[in-house]
């Protein structure tokens, strides 16, 4: 899977606006991952993102438009990971909200 370099830049800009320091980038699942310590919390993947969510938010977030479970093998979803389609993060505030959800997912 490739990733959208413009989306990577948008994620990096959002993290600057959130004053999140120490976040690094790494290739993950064929996309470009953003890491808090050793944990990926959001991955630019295709034209959308993959997000690590807090366990208690997973079921409700899965009901949002443009969101589906992440199943890297095509069969079994990884618990607490969601795919968010490009349309669901078209605006910067929406993208920022998903980034914050990802950060909560790895910091709990």
Language-model features, listed with the residues they occupy:
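Charge-dense, helix-prone N-terminal extensions
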Residues: 1-108
